[in-house]
């Protein structure tokens, strides 16, 4: 019984779409990452302070994201009659023939599903000779006028979904009894369109009933559809389809040359009929895509592997060949630009502007190419292609693009599955001279110039695009196409989205970052996960860690310390203004104040002054001489005053910490003694909450003196449990009732929470009540002014904080709520416009963000009580402006930061190193920006915070949800990776593209010598490199195709039986499908050499120890047995070999295998191994040493196409996890005692689980006990033998996702399985999808208990307190048991990472 948990979601962008989605005037980018939907807004921001940008640039800001229980296959925009936001809707296509229509709901600040349509049960897909839907691609296209959408699925089926538009007859009818019956029974006339909506019949108006037609109904000759797209400028819905009557084939090119047709059909939605408008025949057979072009060009662009063909509305064609094969594969008339040598397979085409017809083309190599059309009025007379040179931004994209979106205003987004997705901008070189149209030089009748009439007609569509230096003819020659492209466009990068996919191989290595000072400098911080990521030129390494590592610069011991603060104060003689940030950083003294508890009621304040990286004791006799307990320390009046808030008084100091003012905390009206328990300080206000739950509000004047602010009756007479001040920069709180003139003056807000957990928001200084938020302690998904229903169960809250989260580009206020058990709830404020009888009313609501972080459970009752005391005394700490980032620090047993970037939602980033008692911002000119930390050992560390590199892509490091990721660019594709434990180095197998030429000395093929082509095919050429984890630089590069790289402990001497860690490399010589492959096994040792004095890190090199050429390609390697031998998969044999002293590899045992061995792995030290074949399933075998032999134990009879596999022991049970080629995960078990196993000859299928990702690696890892298991074992150590799983499986995928399979106990499985059923049936799923159907795999019924879905289970945490308790009671468990189960499956077992 296992559970699959997605630790990191997919990062590769598969689809993108630009549209006004959130509002009618918004500019949004919607991105699909396999099973993840993200909605971005485009924000124009100013240049970063201190940056190199001279002007503002657009940035992507994430609005919402959703984990979808389905795989997105396409996105299209639809303009409906009436949407809730006023913007457009999105039509999403999913795998297995599903469509979902969604819109933006401003009242929920999220998406709303209008309808769901599925065609997977259509009768047309049940034919025995039709492939399964999961094996077929699909095409979705929407009419530019949003009159209908067509969905091609199951190869030859076409679903048509009409939409209602103004003036259509569909708006007036189609609401009869037949429609109601169809909606109720989910049946259709020609299909199975299931329209599941929650709204009334009036809200079903956007669409009409869909119908399914075979493509043969349009034209009987459409037997092999290739691509289709709706066209622009037609009165009726009209689309063009690319198809052939016989299947295209490169191998049969001499018989099937130019067999492709392009036909344009117009649809009659009322009669469900079509009319053929035009048809173009004998098109090149390598055409694969139709791109509809908007005005002024119009028509369609047909893209082939070697050419581009344009077909206008009258059927006129223009074509251009971009490599020399265009003349060989087709007889179609086209312009010759074969000197470009472009490969167009899988390229992406996007328009560059709305005013001209220029197109951006990105081939799989990543280079940027410009496609231009020669226009004669509205007619296209020619096409030309121009590569953009590197100096004009032509090399910004490093790998293939998967999608594109035109965002307007000279901005284009390029999504990629193989590299980071990039937001591009382009500009035109400035000049005052018009440039004549240059496309004419590519036509035969070009005379070198144009008439004035032609020029004026072109200017209608060009505007000032061609306002560049005129073309100069030198010696009768014109500039090249490349220089021409650069003279028109300069491309630059505005923003990018992180992608760590595809992850091809992983290795675990030692981390060199130390978290201790001199006392524990020798202790490393555990392991780090290094993965090979990227494709082609974007290849590199990704270093991943579960938490934030901080580099210790200095440390000191300070006994009995309870808290630490820092204060940056300006010199007394210098006036530092509030707006002069640079002056503050240069002319300020940095003080560190450490509070030491001398008794239960007394604390001594020890003051240090920062000098360089050292803390020097500073004598401040007037600083807390009464040893009162310090609540908080901060600065006011532009860092001219230091304010120390004590329990009994507030003390104000000057720049040298001389006493300036004392303000008592007691109540002056009643003269009763009062004590401060919490405070909030934002210049110029100080809010103090006293022990009688009353509020004291102080304000500093221009001189720095504090005066009490007289509170209104409501604030003064109420009882408060928490207070927080916030300077409203965005105006979201003030905009509720303030005018535009008031926003600049009244931007300070005061948040107060009552004893019944009602949140009051006041504006300062007029103390106007802005909003009242009800039921905060219920923690519902949306906080509003309306009290929650059925709120019998509530959470005990201890603190609320309102602070900015974000980076220098985009920061936004968030409400953070902390509970008694140290749980955190993060809410984002938004304005909801409600339309009542009168004017529309704006209400302030708070949306709950997804939270997947559980606090650690401390062991023992005493530890829990002590932890609660720490939580009460050390509140959440607001950390602002750390390299432009704003975050919130949570102290305690689960320390970490709540962080957010402009392209990610708020998430918790744990701090590695265990317990942290207090933290404060620290900054000097010598060490830069960092923190000072107080840990459990009462050690005060000066830390260089790596947040500046972890949260900024400019340095190659990122924070990605609970993990930190550092990207190391290599510049080549990294296919294999191994960690050399003896040297501490990483050995990587890289590859790069190189041209393949036929050998001219081949005696069997003398005709190869006469080959005249200059456009050679490309193959991968491999090399080995050694990378240092200290500097992440390549230090050795010794070149055959690397198939496997492993680190093994091999026996290097037959006499002494000495063993040493070696790097074993398997290679293959593949020269074509008609020539047998050869291979070789290399054994290397990473040795130390004398480095170059200028580069001391270059002190390692690979030394060849052994080499063994073999027959057949070496496709997999593994260590086996206990004698230091290795097993080699070579061709159709698996041979166990031992390293001899002469460097040869002696075979000792073998086994014949199937076709192509993709995986060989041993259960370490047992001799049991799995041998997985790429097409013939998996074998379970064993190796014995006395005598040497290999034996077959069991087989997988399903003949799986194995991509990755590994063992997963669970107690006395042995499971094998197998990843197939259809994104499924199979759990097999070897159980010879089961009668179904035929005495152990068969591997039993226990469960099948659809991950939605193409899995690249499965790695068996040890599992550390989590805090809940440690607590149970401590309590029940003498009573019960607790069985804790010792193994887990780490999964990486091609799209960048990282998952974990964890074994769970019988009791936990029943509890979580029941919870999963409840969540599946009760919560609302995005796009109306069914998570149970998404994870299910069709089988013959032999599978047992299904694998649990951790991503679905964690949605229980986002529910309100009442719903959590209700669902937990239905499951028969309490909250603590469910949270303990969540902790076990959430990845906390990776304690060493």
From Swiss-Prot:
Asked if the Swiss-Prot or TrEMBL record annotates the protein with the keyword DNA repair, the reply is no
Q: Which UniProt keywords apply?
A: mRNA processing, Nucleus, RNA-binding
User: InterPro entries, per this entry?
Assistant: Beta-prop_RSE1/DDB1/CPSF1_1st, Cleavage/polyA-sp_fac_asu_C, RSE1/DDB1/CFT1/CPSF1, WD40/YVTN_repeat-like_dom_sf
Q: Which GO terms describe its cellular component?
A: nucleus
* Biological process, per Gene Ontology: mRNA processing
Where in or outside the cell it occurs: the entry states: Nucleus
What Pfam family is a match for this entry? Beta-prop_RSE1_1st
Molecular function as annotated in GO: RNA binding
S-S bridge residues: none
Coiled-coil residues? none
Specify where the region named Disordered lies, as residue ranges: 427-458
**PANTHER family the record matches:** DNA REPAIR/RNA PROCESSING CPSF FAMILY
Homology family: Belongs to the CFT1 family.
Report the protein's function: RNA-binding component of the cleavage and polyadenylation factor (CPF) complex, which plays a key role in polyadenylation-dependent pre-mRNA 3'-end formation and cooperates with cleavage factors including the CFIA complex and NAB4/CFIB. Involved in poly(A) site recognition. May be involved in coupling transcription termination and mRNA 3'-end formation.
Q: What is this protein called?
A: Protein cft1
The organism named in the record is Aspergillus oryzae (strain ATCC 42149 / RIB 40)
């Amino acid at each position: 019984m296992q559970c699959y948990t997605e630790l990191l979601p997919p990062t590769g962008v598969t689809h993108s779409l630009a549209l006004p989605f959130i509002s009618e005037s918004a500019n949004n980018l919607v991105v699909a990452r396999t099973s993840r939907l993200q909605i971005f807004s485009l924000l124009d921001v100013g240049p970063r302070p201190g940056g190199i940008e001279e002007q503002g640039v657009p940035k992507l800001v994430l609005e919402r994201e959703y984990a979808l229980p389905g795989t997105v296959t396409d996105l299209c925009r639809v303009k409906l009659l009436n949407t809730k936001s006023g913007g457009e809707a999105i039509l999403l296509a999913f795998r297995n023939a599903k469509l979902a229509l969604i819109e933006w709901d401003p009242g929920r600040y999220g998406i709303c599903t209008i309808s769901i349509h599925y065609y997977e049960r259509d009768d047309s897909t049940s034919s025995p000779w039709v492939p399964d839907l999961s094996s077929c691609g699909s095409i979705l296209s929407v009419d530019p006028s949003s009159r209908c959408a067509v969905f091609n699925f199951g190869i030859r089926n076409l679903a048509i979904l009409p939409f209602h538009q103004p003036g259509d007859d569909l708006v007036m009818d189609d609401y009869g009894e037949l429609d109601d019956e169809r909606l109720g029974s989910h049946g259709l006339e020609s299909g199975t369109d299931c329209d599941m909506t929650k709204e009334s019949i009036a809200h079903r108006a956007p669409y009409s009933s869909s119908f399914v037609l075979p493509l043969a109904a349009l034209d009987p000759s459409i037997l092999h559809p290739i691509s289709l797209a709706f066209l622009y400028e037609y009165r009726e819905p009209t689309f063009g389809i690319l198809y052939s009557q016989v299947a295209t084939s490169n191998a049969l090119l001499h018989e099937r040359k130019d067999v492709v047709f392009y036909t344009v059909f117009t649809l009659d939605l009322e009669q469900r009929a079509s009319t053929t408008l035009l048809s173009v025949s004998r098109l090149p057979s390598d055409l694969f895509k139709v791109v509809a072009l908007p005005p002024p060009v119009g028509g369609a662009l047909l893209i082939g592997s070697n050419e581009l063909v344009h077909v206008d509305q009258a059927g006129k064609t223009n074509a251009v060949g971009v490599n020399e094969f265009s003349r060989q594969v087709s007889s179609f008339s086209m312009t010759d630009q074969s000197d470009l040598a472009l490969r167009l397979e899988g390229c992406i085409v996007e328009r560059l502007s709305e005013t001209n017809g220029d197109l951006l083309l990105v081939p799989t190599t990543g280079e940027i190419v410009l496609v231009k059309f020669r226009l004669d009025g509205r007619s296209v007379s020619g096409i030309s292609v121009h590569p953009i040179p590197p100096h004009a931004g032509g090399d910004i994209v490093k790998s293939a693009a998967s999608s594109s979106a035109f965002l307007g205003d000279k901005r284009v987004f390029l999504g990629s599955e193989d590299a980071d997705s990039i937001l591009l901008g382009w500009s035109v070189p400035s000049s005052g001279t018009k440039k004549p149209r240059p496309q004419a030089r590519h036509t035969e009748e070009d005379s070198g110039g144009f008439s004035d009439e032609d020029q004026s007609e072109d200017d209608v569509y060009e505007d000032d695009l061609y306002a560049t230096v005129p073309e100069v003819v030198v010696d009768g020659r014109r500039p090249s196409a490349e220089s021409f492209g650069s003279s028109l466009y300069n491309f630059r990068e505005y923003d990018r989205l992180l992608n760590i996919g595809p992850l091809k191989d992983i290795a675990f290595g030692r981390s060199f970052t130390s978290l201790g000072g001199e006392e524990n400098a020798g202790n490393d911080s555990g392991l780090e996960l290094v993965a090979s990521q990227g494709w082609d030129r974007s290849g590199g390494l990704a270093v991943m860690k579960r938490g934030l590592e901080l580099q210790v610069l200095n440390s000191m011991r300070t006994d009995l310390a309870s808290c630490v603060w820092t204060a940056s104060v300006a010199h007394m003689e210098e006036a530092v203004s509030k707006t002069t940030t640079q002056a503050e950083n240069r002319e300020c003294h940095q003080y560190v104040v450490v509070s030491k508890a001398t008794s239960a009621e007394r604390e001594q304040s020890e003051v240090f002054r920062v000098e360089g990286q050292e803390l020097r004791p500073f004598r401040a006799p007037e600083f807390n001489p009464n040893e009162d307990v310090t609540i908080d320390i901060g600065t006011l009046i532009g860092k001219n005053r230091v304010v120390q808030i004590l329990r009994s008084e507030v003390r104000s100091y000057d720049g040298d910490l001389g006493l300036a003012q004392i303000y008592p905390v007691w109540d002056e009206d009643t003269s009763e003694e009062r004590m401060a328990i919490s405070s909030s300080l934002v210049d110029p206000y100080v809010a103090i909450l006293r022990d009688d739950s009353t509020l004291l509000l102080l304000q500093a004047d221009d001189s720095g003196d504090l005066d009490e602010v007289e509170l209104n009756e409501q604030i003064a007479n109420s009882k408060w449990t928490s207070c927080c001040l916030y300077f409203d920069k965005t105006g979201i709180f003030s905009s509720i009732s303030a005018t535009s003139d008031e926003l600049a003056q009244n931007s300070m807000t005061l948040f107060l929470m009552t004893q019944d957990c009602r949140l009051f928001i006041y504006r300062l200084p007029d103390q106007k009540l802005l909003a009242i938020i009800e039921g905060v302690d219920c923690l519902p998904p949306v906080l509003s002014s309306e009290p929650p229903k059925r709120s019998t169960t509530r959470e005990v809250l201890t603190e609320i904080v309102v602070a900015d989260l974000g980076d220098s580009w985009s920061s936004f206020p968030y409400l953070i709520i902390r509970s008694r058990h140290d749980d955190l709830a993060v809410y984002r404020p938004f304005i909801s416009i409600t339309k009542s009888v009168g004017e529309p009313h704006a209400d302030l609501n708070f949306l709950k963000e997804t939270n997947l972080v559980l606090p650690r459970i401390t062991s023992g009752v005493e530890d829990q009580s002590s932890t609660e005391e720490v939580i009460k005394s050390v509140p959440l700490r607001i950390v602002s402006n750390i390299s432009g980032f704003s975050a919130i620090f949570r102290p305690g047993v689960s320390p970490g930061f709540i962080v957010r970037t402009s392209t990610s939602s708020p998430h918790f980033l744990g701090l590695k190193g265990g317990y942290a008692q207090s933290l404060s911002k620290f900054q000097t000119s010598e060490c830069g920006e960092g923190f000072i930390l107080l840990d459990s050992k009462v050690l005060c560390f000066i830390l260089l915070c790596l947040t500046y590199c972890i949260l900024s892509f400019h340095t190659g490091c990122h924070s990605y949800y609970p993990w930190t990721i550092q990207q190391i660019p290599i510049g080549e594709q990294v296919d294999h990776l191994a960690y050399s434990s003896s040297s501490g180095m990483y050995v990587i197998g890289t590859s790069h593209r190189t041209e393949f030429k036929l050998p001219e000395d081949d005696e069997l093929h003398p005709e190869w010598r006469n080959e005249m082509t200059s456009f050679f095919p490309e193959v991968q050429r491999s090399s080995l490199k050694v990378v240092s984890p200290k500097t992440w630089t390549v230090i050795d590069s010794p070149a055959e195709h690397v198939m496997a790289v492993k680190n093994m402990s091999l026996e290097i001497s037959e006499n002494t039986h000495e063993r040493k860690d070696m790097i074993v490399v398997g290679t293959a010589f593949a020269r074509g499908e008609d020539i047998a492959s050869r291979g070789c096994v290399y054994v290397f040792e990473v040795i130390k050499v004398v480095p170059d004095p200028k580069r001391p890190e270059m002190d390692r090199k690979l030394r060849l120890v052994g080499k063994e050429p073999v027959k057949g390609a070496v496709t997999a390697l593994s260590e086996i047995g206990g004698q230091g031998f290795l097993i080699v998969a070579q061709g159709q044999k698996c041979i166990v070999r031992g390293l001899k002293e002469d460097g040869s590899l002696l075979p000792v045992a073998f086994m014949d295998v199937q076709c192509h061995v993709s995986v060989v792995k041993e259960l370490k030290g047992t001799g049991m191994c799995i041998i997985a074949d790429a097409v013939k399933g998996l074998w379970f075998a064993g190796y014995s040493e006395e005598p040497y032999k290999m034996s077959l134990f069991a087989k997988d009879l399903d003949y799986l196409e194995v991509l990755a596999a590994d063992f997963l022991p669970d107690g006395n049970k042995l499971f094998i996890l197998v990843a197939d080629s259809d994104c499924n995960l199979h759990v097999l078990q070897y159980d010879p005692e089961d009668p179904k196993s035929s005495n152990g000859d068969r591997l039993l299928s226990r469960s099948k689980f659809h991950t939605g990702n193409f899995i690249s690696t499965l790695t068996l890892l040890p599992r550390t006990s989590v805090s809940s298991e440690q607590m149970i074992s401590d309590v029940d150590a003498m009573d019960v033998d607790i069985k804790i799983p010792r193994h887990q499986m780490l999964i990486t995928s091609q799209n960048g996702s990282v998952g974990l399979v964890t074994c769970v106990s019988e009791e936990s499985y029943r509890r979580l399985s029941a919870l999963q059923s409840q969540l599946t049936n009760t919560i609302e799923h995005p796009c109306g999808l069914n998570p149970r159907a998404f994870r299910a795999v069709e089988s013959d019924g032999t599978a047992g208990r299904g694998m649990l879905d951790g991503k679905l289970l964690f949605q229980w945490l986002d529910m309100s307190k009442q719903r959590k308790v209700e669902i937990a009671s239905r499951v028969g468990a309490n909250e603590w048991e469910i949270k303990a189960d969540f902790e076990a499956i959430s990845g906390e077992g990776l304690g060493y990472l």
